[in-house]
Structures are given as structure tokens and as C-alpha cells.
Amino acid sequence: MKSNTPTEDSTKWMLESVEIDSMGESSSKEPEINLNKNEGGLKKNASRNLGVGSIIRTLSVSNWRKSGNLGSPSTRKSGNLGPPTNAVPKKTGPQRVERTTSSAARGLQSLRFLDRTVTGRERDAWRSIENRFNQFSVDGKLPKEKFGVCIGMGDTMEFAAEVYEALGRRRQIETENGIDKEQLKLFWEDMIKKDLDCRLQIFFDMCDKNGDGKLTEEEVKEVIVLSASANRLGNLKKNAAAYASLIMEELDPDHKGYIEMWQLEILLTGMVTNADTEKMKKSQTLTRAMIPERYRTPMSKYVSVTAELMHENWKKLWVLALWAIINVYLFMWKYEEFMRNPLYNITGRCVCAAKGAAETLKLNMALILVPVCRKTLTILRSTFLNRVVPFDDNINFHKVIAYMIAFQALLHTALHIFCNYPRLSSCSYDVFLTYAGAALGNTQPSYLGLMLTSVSITGVLMIFFMGFSFTLAMHYFRRNIVKLPKPFNVLAGFNAFWYAHHLLVLAYILLIIHGYYLIIEKPWYQKTTWMYLAVPMLFYASERLFSRLLQEHSHRVNVIKAIVYSGNVLALYVTKPPGFKYKSGMYMFVKCPDLSKFEWHPFSITSAPGDDYLSVHIRALGDWTTELRSRFAKTCEPTQAAAKPKPNSLMRMETRAAGVNPHIEESQVLFPKIFIKGPYGAPAQNYQKFDILLLVGLGIGATPFISILKDMLNHLKPGIPRSGQKYEGSVGGESIGGDSVSGGGGKKFPQRAYFFWVTREQASFDWFKGVMDDIAEYDKTHVIEMHNYLTSMYEAGDARSALIAMVQKLQHAKNGVDIVSESRIRTHFARPNWRKVFSELSSKHEACRIGVFYCGSPTLVRPLKELCQEFSLESSTRFTFHKENF
């Protein structure tokens, strides 16, 4: 900010603080910054078009005082900090920044050289460092390349090496041949000092390698490259020169060719505010104040927690209770029936328990097919039954029944082999003839004879097929966590699970044979196995076979566009079959006959229901997905934009058929054939019944929620036509015609949606960059808040990410573009503080129903569920948790 008066020309301004949203920033928000000049009350609202250089100079030089240890070489020697003395009127000698207590606290939190976990445990950490020193030192000297490993910065060796050099220059220690333990202790003490100036001095010494107190553009670039490498930000590293130029442009308005240390310090101390901590404490206090009296004693809280669990899971409870009651009833009915059977006098209770287990086994072998009739369940989700039946837990119920089947089958088999058969074959002939002769004939069988009957053989084979299929369906096998040696490695992974499950067809055939050819002869109408299985098997077979034949004919789709992203992700845009109606959050199955004629794989639909195309984003994790990505990569060519990349752009390969080639059918010879079937219901499709949405996606787990965001965004865009009319939408950033969903009809939508996307790769943000930019542009009322988190980066305040945070702030303020995601949505470092997120939502949306939808790694399921329960109990807001299951 410049002025025509001499007094104002000589005034330097300092950024006291920049308010940062504790959960994340939406680029559509304009931060409000208070500017105080001298003792005047000048206040201005900083918008995106406010120059960053003018923001830097927001406080007058009257806030400087003596002492310190930063600045020019002369000020360093004298132990003082400040700008050149000629920049401060009416002052003599070097000066230092006047920091308020809150400002110092913010700066202290905003510059750490070690992980936050070390704070408060410095003594324990030093003992570990001593042990590592003894391990890695050579002749009592620790070499530079082992310094990072020794102090706990082993994953950022280059950055640790620069810290090593800076600490050596600071202590005037010759470090070329390594350092001893005493010198290492001095380095360690400097790094953990609570003195803000000491930490800043180390950081500045890293930047200012020649020690002249001035940073040139080349030195700034080197530190940006170093920080980008430490945080695994390849694209930022490529553009380091541009970002160094940006810093020089904003901090060196007079084009001196350098910036001074005090200018960099001003910007660094303004990056983080303590408002987050205050806000969290305030929200927690308010939340605790809202706790009803009945929750405040241990017993009352236990009762309340139990009641809350029952309220949250009442659908599951009544279904499981009904299922358990039926199982117990059938077991006891058959048990009592055989207590009156003559065989009871020979085998005792063994035959009763075996027959009871067999009866419940028939029931469960029939029921286990119901949860996997996906098409039927999808239809039922839209009926009144969805209010009382937990369709979202179909896979979990399927697993529970499977465990029960395994138990009942083993119990039934063990009782026959180890109890019934030995007693029947070893009892006296007279006893056998008296009690078993009428059922088994006059010839007493041997144990081997009983084992070689058709009943025993089919039973053992059935156990083998079921055991094999169940084992490969376990989490460790299905997710390929178990690493088997060759050639047994083919038994782990999704393909093994999928094909092994088809062996259960043989198990069902054997079950029917096993239940019909009994050792104890009965009339056909008393053989009930086929009665249990007939309807479920016919129903399941018709859904799998007949509907598949029809769907493959009508659901052969044409590829509109395929995009191969870095990060092993393939985005497919295909034609939408006539009559293919779905809701946001649903998924569909995809098959590529060129790869496998029998494999179908589920993927969330990422297009909105109103689009006239279908899209899925597929991450290459297994053999099938990897080969599919490879096939499409061969047909993809770099686009013109990718051939000449713009600054901050991510490289991608794509190919298009629609819009470029009007003969789309002819162009399909380039691509592998694609078939789809669906759509199928998923928990996220019920998002509309909640007041507020909290959508949490980890990595590729964001896909179910992209369709929801697109659908909501379509209702926010101005001038959206009614259903049936065309509008120009976007597909992966490219313009393509589509149908919009109707904005009328009284369709209920949530009031707000908070989307938290947590990923560990910078390239992931390119998958949905177009959606993020559309939200920033069209969501003027802030209905959708996006919070992107990159876990590969060190959290805000770490020295390894401090300069990146500064560049990010400058770039976003100047151009409205985030340097990490390269979209208009701001990216946060490390992981979200979920307790803070829930605390703020509960205080912000009192007495609202918040739907928490999660898709990603199982590690986060339990913490999110516990937070939902905790804050539902302790506030008037009710959180309902849903997890995506395929």
C-alpha cells in the first residue's frame, strides 16, 4: 500500500495475523483482515484482488523495540533484530519486532523443527538420540548424512542436512568431518528451545547460506525446492522458480534483488493464528455446558449411552433378534423331536444337537442369498421398508450368517463323526436292532461303512468347498494382505475371492443331495432341505442369470472419454443407457470382456443423475484394474494442453470420442469393450433425508460423494434448465452437453454439506479438479464446503512446511489458486482434527440431524463412530454414521 505523503512512504507495515478457518478454507470465502496504521483505527476488508504486498505492510514501525538476534550481519553481531536502521524514523540503533504475547505464541506454534509428539518428552527423546548416536557414529563422530536419522528426521534427509549446516554456522562449529555427542546435544537444545527468535534464526540461517542477512531469489528458490522435496510435492518443485519470483515480487517491491530477514519473519509469524485453539476451547465449553443432568454421573451416562446405541442401531437389533429367535426355535424344535426318537437311546443328545444344527443350517443357507440380491435390495430401498430394514448393512448381515453357517456345519459334522457314528457302529447288535433297526435296517454298519455313505461323502465335500470359499473371503486374503509364496500367491486377492465364491454353487448342489439321500429313510415331503432352498435359490439365480443376459444386451456402453491420471487412476466417461436411472451415491458393476468374460467389479458412480453420461473413477490396485488402466493408457494420447503444460498444471493423458468424432460407434474399435450393470443401492443415496452432511473420503474413497456434490451443485448453478433440456456441463474439465436434474418438484436437499477429502498424493487432486473449481465458482451461498487434506505434508507450523504455507497464502491471495491442489479450493496440511470438526459442527448446527458418510480405510471407522456417539450424547445435534459397503 503506497501513499503520496513522505511520512507514509517511510512506513513499513507488518501482517499481525491472518485468520485461518480451523477446519479448512473454501476459496469462495473472502478473509477479513483488520489493518491498523500507527495508532489510528484504519480497517479494511482484504479481498482476493487486494495486493499481497500491501497486506505485508499492515502495521507501523512504531511497534519495533530493541534486542533480538536477527537481521543484517551487523544486527546479528550485536544481538539485535530489525530492519535497517534508516527505515525507522526517530530511532537509533537496530530494532526488533514488537510482538504481543499472542503473536509470539502463534509464531512459536508456527515454526517447529520436530514433530509435535516430541513436545513435553524432550528427555525421553534425547535418550533415544543418544542410542542412535552410539549406533551411527564413527570414531565418536556423527556424519552429516546420519544426522536426520539420529534426531528423528530420517524421512527428510536433505532438509535435515540443511538444518545441520545451519546449526553448525550458528554455533561456529566445523561440521565437515561430523560432530561429537556434546555438539549434537548443543544442536538438539537449539532445535527444542522455546525461544521464538532462536527457532527463527535457525530457519533463516538455512535460507541465508552466505550469512549476509539478505535472501536472493535463488536462495528462496533453493529452500522451496528443499521443502517441496521434504513434503513430496513434485509439481511444486517444478514451479519453484515461479513461486520464488512471487515472494520476491511481494516482499521486494523496490526491486532491490533481495529481501531481509525481518520481512520473512513478519510473513512467517502471520501464517498461523491462535484463534483455532480459542475456538476449540470455546466450542468444547459450550458443548459440555449443554450436557443434560442425566449424563453427568457414571451410571446415568452408562444408561444414556446404552439407550443411544439402541436408538442408533434399532433396525439392526430387531433384525438380528428375529433371526436369532428363529434359529433358536428351529434348533430346539428339532432337538426335542429327536429326544423322542429311538436313536436317542443309542447316541444320546449327540443326535439331537446334530439334527438341530442341521435344521438351522438349512435356514441360514437359504437366508445368506438374500443380502446379495443387489437389484432386489436396490428396489426395496425406495419403499417404506427402508424405514425399518437396515439395507445398508446387507454385506455385514451376509457375513454374520456366514459365520453362523461355518459354526453350524462344523458342529453338525463333528457330532456325527465323533459321536453318532462311533456309538452306532460299536453298540451291541441287540441294542442296534431294537432302537435303530427300523430306521437303518437289520444290518449294523461299521464306522467305515457310515463314512462311505453318500450322506457322509457329500457332507465332507460340502465342508471342503465352504471352508475354501470362506477362507479366501476373509479380509486378509481378499485384500491381498497375506503374502503367500509362489505358486500359492494366486489364492490371495479379489480374483481368488470372486472365483472361489462360485464354488459355492457346488456346495448348494451337494447340500440338496445331502438332504435328500438320508441314512434314515423318510418320505420325500418330510425331507425339508429343498423346501428351504427352493425360493431363495430360484430368486438369486434369476437375478444373476436371466437379468444379466438382458442387461449385457442393453447395457453395452460406448466410451465417450477416458482419462489416465497420475496416481494410477483411470476415469471412464461412457454413454448412459436408456432408462438407466440412479441416485447420487449409488454404484454399478463394470466388466471388460477383453480382460475377463466373467469378472464384474463395483465402482461408485461419479456423475450426477442429471448428466447424460455415466462416469467412474477406477484406481489400479489389483490385476484387473491395473490391466484395464494399461489398456486405456495405450489408446490415450497427451492432449494439446498436456503437450504444452501451463504453469501449475498436472500432466494427464486422455482420449475423447464424443464431441470430436461424430461417429462414436466407429471410434469404439480403439477402446476395450465395456459392459455395465446396475445401478445398485448404497448408504450414501439416502443423503437427502439429513439436514447437514459430513462427507469423509480417503483417497479414492471420495468417489461416492462426488456425485452428491455434483447433484447439489446442479441445483445451485444459475439458469439451470428443467429436466429434459440441454445445458453445457463439464466432463473432467471439458465441455459436454447434458441433462440437468429438475430444480423443482419439491425435492429436499441438505442445508449444508461439508466434504473432507484426505489423500496422501498431490496428484489425487487432479481427479476432481473440475468439480472443485465449479464449487468455488457457482456456490455463492457456501452450501458446500470442501476441505482437502494432504497427509504427505508436514502439519502447519512444521519448519519443513513453513515456506510452503507462506507461498500458498501468497499465491491464493493473489491469484485465487491453491499451489497444492492447483484448484480454487485451499489445501490443508497433514490430517484433520476430527474432534475439532465434530465440536464445531455440533455447536454450529444445534438440534440438526447430521449424516456422516464415510468411504475409505477401515482404520477411521471406529474413531468416527465413537465421535458420532459422543457428540450425539453431549449436544442437541444428532450424528448418524454410515459406511460404504460393496
From Swiss-Prot:
According to its UniProt record, the EC number is: 1.11.1.-, 1.6.3.-
FAD-binding FR-type domain boundaries: 552-686
- Chain segments carrying region Disordered: 1-46, 64-103
Stretches assigned to the Extracellular side? 338-404, 478-499, 547-688
Q: Which residues form the Ferric oxidoreductase domain?
A: 355-512
User: What Pfam families does the record point to?
Assistant: FAD_binding_8, Ferric_reduct, NAD_binding_6, NADPH_Ox
Q: Which PANTHER family does its entry note? A: NADPH OXIDASE, RESPIRATORY BURST OXIDASE HOMOLOG PROTEIN H-RELATED
Give the protein's recorded name.
Putative respiratory burst oxidase homolog protein H
Q: Which organism is it from?
A: Arabidopsis thaliana
